[in-house]
Amino acid sequence: MKKYIALTLLITTVCFAQKTAVYCIGDSTMADKKDPERNPEHGWAQVLQPFFNDNIVIINKAVNGRSTKSFINEKRWDSVYNKLKKGDYVFIEFGHNDEKIEDSTRYTNPHTAYRHNLIRFVKESREKGAIPILLTSIARRNFNEKGVLVPTHGDYPLETRLAAQEYSVPLIDLEYHTELLEQSYGPEKSKQLHLHFKAGENAYYDKDKADDTHLSKKGAVEVAGIVVKQLKILQDKSLEKLKKSMK
């Protein structure tokens, strides 16, 4: 009996070791949410696993409210780095909270600290033999009175693109593709992608809710679908394992 148990544990360990981990680091637009059956808010990495078969394991380490600075200072990056193994992937999407100039624990200058933090994630992932993928911040639903979607992220997406170019990192330009998504829905229907409820309309909220940054489950699934579609399009041999494991 003991031999049987030991053999079972060995097989389980070997099977898990053969799986490829995808670590997701970022902010609330990516993060898992509590009580997902009731909570309308979802991060896009929270709904990413169903797009892949069992050879890929999504490990979502994104946390609400984090910037590159606070993610590092709270040792969250260290906890990911210490677990990385050769062939793993690291999806990196920050920016929303790096913009918080009124908060010294989170704010980063896009051209200096933000850029250097992204480069740190890239270099240290590669040190462990893992494959980093940079993603620009998802767009906010920010239509003006003329129905024009107005950008809100300043130079953060630009610095992400430049870092990806300089260090030959696969890039998914989520800002651009989610702009197209918002525009395809239009000023009114795009509310479905986010959190818009009247008081009493949803049991999770007892007051009116109008949140144009965070995603509904519908919005999260749309964004996760964009990520997968763009991974398929990218011409990079390091992504073949991901592509072969897509459903």
What are these language model-derived features?
Residues 17-62, 78-88:
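Serine-esterase "nucleophile elbow" of acetyl-processing enzymes
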Residues 31, 53, 72, 214-216:
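Generic, ordered loop/turn and secondary-structure boundary motif
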